[in-house]
Amino acid sequence: MKKFLFVILVLGAFVLAACGGGATEAPATLAPVPADFAGKTNPLGADAATDGAKVFQVNCEPCHGPKGHGDGPAGTALDPKPKNLGVIQQMAGDDFLFWRISTGSPGTSMAPWQGILTEDQIWQVVAFVRTLQP
């Protein structure tokens, strides 16, 4: 009987392990950054993430959620769903993040923020996104 319970527990653990992790998966590759954005790095100082959190809360959190996981209340109706920024920031350079925030993402509901946010505000959001975890 003990052997049977052990086998059931082990099999259950494998099933749970196989089902986990889907929510934080990201695309295998990111789109290439256009030449006019490639190589850009954040010019702002260490306090930029604090200011970026405020900008993110007002402008990004409705879709991306408070932790950037793509689970904001406005994002639930979107197709495709907003990206998990904690995962994306691990894959992307500052240039990619600045580009996507500035110009949006075709085929998604990610709108361009260039002209709505200042360049410094976009860099502040980039700094804040760098603090997010998957």
Question: Which residues does each PLM region occupy?
Answer:
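Positively charged n-region of N-terminal signal peptides that target proteins for export
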Residues: 1-4
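Sec-dependent N-terminal signal peptides
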Residues: 6-13
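C-terminal motif of bacterial Sec signal peptides marking the signal peptidase cleavage site
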Residues: 15-18
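Electrostatic cytochrome c docking/interface patches
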Residues: 24-55
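Sequence/structural segment immediately N-terminal to covalent heme-attachment motifs in c-type
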Residues: 46-69, 97-99
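Inter-heme linker and motif-flanking segments adjacent to c-type heme-binding CXXCH motifs
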Residues: 69, 131-134
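Short cysteine/histidine-rich zinc-coordinating motifs and their immediately flanking basic loops
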Residues: 73-77
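Extracytoplasmic electron-transfer domains, predominantly the class I c-type cytochrome c fold
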Residues: 79-132
